[in-house]
Amino acid sequence: MGTVRPTLRGRRSGVLLIQVARTLGLGLILAGALSAAAAAQTVTVTARGQTAPVGTVADDAADDPAIWWNSRDPEKSLIVGTDKKAGLHVYRLSGESVHFTPAGRVNNVDLVDLGTQGVLVVASDRNDLAAARLKFYRLDTRKGALVPLGEASGGTGEAYGVCLAVLGRQIHAFSVLKDGGIVQVRLDRGRNKVTGTTVRNLRVPSQAEGCVVDNRTRTLYVGEERAGVWVFDARPDAPSEGRLAIRADGVQLVPDVEGLALAPEGQTGGWLVVSSQGDNAYALYRLPELAPAGRFRISGGELGSTEETDGIALALGRFGRTYPEGLFIAQDGDNAPAAQNFKLASWADILKAVRAGTP
């Protein structure tokens, strides 16, 4: 069979098709770039308060906060924060440290208000790098002090993160190990003592720390520092496999992935906030679909910015006139010339800035 040569019209059609394909391809690339730019748009809010510096100076020491909301007198709410070289501070909203509990190398902290049963506090104890421990306390809300309630095993390895879950009538703690292991511990609460029983083991592929549980949907979120955010079913009888639901893409979320916090809304909605440590920002994701919903930084003003944030905490509700819709707290990794501390921001300010800055 002889060679079939395209006519001039055919050649022109081919060129036109190539040009259209190139244009469409460029359009898709531009659309992707615009989507990434929209996801990565970062707004700024100003800190409205800060805590006193931790006691350990000239070192990476402040790490993780937890918030107790005083529903009867919101301005008397309390903050528990770790000095991971020395122990636990209890702060007022004014930033004053009202109590310090020596505990050595405690890394992360979480708490849950159990109503008439008191406020339970747990800290990840890494004093023994080969044997993680969970330390339990009761928060004396009148004195602003921590009362020891015992401890439990948090697994084999170095303790890093910890978060609490209310699953029906049971309280569970998730102990996140530095190597990516996650140990689920059911807590047994006596009158003046808390013990724990390991009920399940989970894992992410590499170093992890931050975690938070959505009690409404029984979902555990865990930050794998170089990869993103994993999602697990928090129920003790659920399958142990998780999924990498949010990737650290270097745009919306820049490694290291550190602290996680939730702002629940309705039955399944709200926001997940993630510390984007690599560019000193915080990434927002809309629940339940985990769609990117903006980014913000804490910067400017008399109190300065936050850098290299490890732990974060977020509690909704009125915390007085300064924090009318909720309180967001972030560890500040560079509070020079003073030691590291925690910065306080208004959740209302954050939402207003993010909504105004969304294309």
Task: For each feature predicted by the language model, list its residue ranges.
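N-terminal secretory signal peptides that target proteins for export/translocation
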Residues: 1-19
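Bacterial N-terminal signal peptides
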Residues: 19-33
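Sequence/structural signature of beta-propeller domains
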Residues: 39-359
